[in-house]
Amino acid sequence: MLRYSPMSSLQYPSSLLQSMILPMRFRLLLSVVSCLYALCLSVLGAPPLEELEQAAFENASRAVQDSVVQVETFGGAELVNRQFAAAGPSTGSIVSSDGWIITSSFPFRNQPASINVILANGERKPAKLIARDYSRELALLKIEVDTPLTPLLASDRKAWQVGQWALALGKTFGPEQASCSVGILSAMGRVWNKAIQTDAKVSPQNYGGPLIDLNGRAMGILTPINPGIVSEGEVEQWYDSGIGFAIPFQDILDRLPRLQAGEDIYSGRVGFRWKGNDEYSEAVVLQGITPGSPAAKAGIETGDKILAGGPAPDQLVAIRNHSDLKHVLGPVDAGGTIVFEIERSAERRQLQCELVRELPTYREPFLGVLIDPTADPKTPVIRGVIPESPAMKAGLQVGEIIESIDKQSINQERTLDVRLGNLNYRDSVPIVLK
């Protein structure tokens, strides 16, 4: 411990002095090494770090100049969802040498009368809108070419690291030179596992342009997709928010054959809803199943607990909460399949669903009985029967107990309401009474 002397000076123990001297020696050595390194750089004429970074940015941007085009639209609706539709030029990215161009669907919300693509050499080509990916806010264009174009090359997704440099390119000011903003890859698996995130400055004119690495390879295509998007008219609220999103380029290439065939792509819907509102702390316990939905056809029931999900039985990932479920469902398109591992009555089973674009219109099944609210839910007692209802036509009587419906017993977990909720409107099912 420190000792106080009458001279108001501090005397340190020898062990403490030794521990202080070592860091001081280390700092002195580090300073000497730094000075020598700086001296060597000045003698050898090596460029400073800022110049090396600038050269890397310029080389990466230059590598994709011919693969980035300007997209012009003309005509179409002036208002979309009570907002003025975009009319200025936007950006496209060449994905094949024979004239296929991926871009954002942002300029096409107003259904333009004509589309032009301006290549890097200034040549203007008429373009056709072939298909759209509504889930990712993308569109595929086709132009006719006389000479092969230079397509983007895909970045190695396995090598990505959060924090690495990322460059956002767009043909904002003219077709000859792409504008470039510098940032980092700030997050992956965003927008329910459909996008990557960057802090590079992104504007509506950059949408459709590539997000590239320092090797000039495409990491993704910039798009106005956002986590809370409900309709196309809401994309502007994220402009200049400090972050931007890009759809991974390899994901686009995987779907390219479908788009080239003229097939529009939509988000897949499964047809169940779950209990609770906490995204991160509550397990996924199903509260309802839409009749006729993929979930209903797969045999998923109200009360099931979802434990895992994935594209195949050997590719399941754990689903611990609502957020995990959304990340599993997010990238699955309509027509795609997903396997769920569920827990029901302490037993585990795997069920496969084929997701659809739209769920069938739900009409709540109507039996026509009033249940005694004081009765045990496991033994629902009929308190009243509504005239002309299915229950009256079937001969149900006041005082009877409903034991099962559609060959499914009534119990604490599977109450009468739950069993009815799993039926379709106008289903004809057997009811066992006591």
Model-inferred region functions:
Residues 101-103, 215, 219, 295-322, ...:
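Conserved PDZ fold ligand-binding element
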Residues 207-210, 280, 290-306, 328, ...:
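PDZ/PDZ-like domain micro-motif
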Residues 48-61, 149, 214, 218-278, ...:
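C-terminal cap/linker of serine protease catalytic domains
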Residues 68-72, 101-105, 159-172, 184, ...:
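Active-site-proximal beta-strands of protease catalytic cores
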Residues 46-51, 76-77, 96-178, 191-197, ...:
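Conserved active-site neighborhood of the chymotrypsin/trypsin-like protease fold
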Residues 107-110, 238, 308-341, 404-432:
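PDZ domains, with a preference for the canonical peptide-binding region formed by the helix
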Residues 67, 81, 85, 144-152, ...:
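Active-site region of chymotrypsin-like
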Residues 44-93, 97-100, 104, 112-114, ...:
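N-terminal activation segment of mature serine protease catalytic domains
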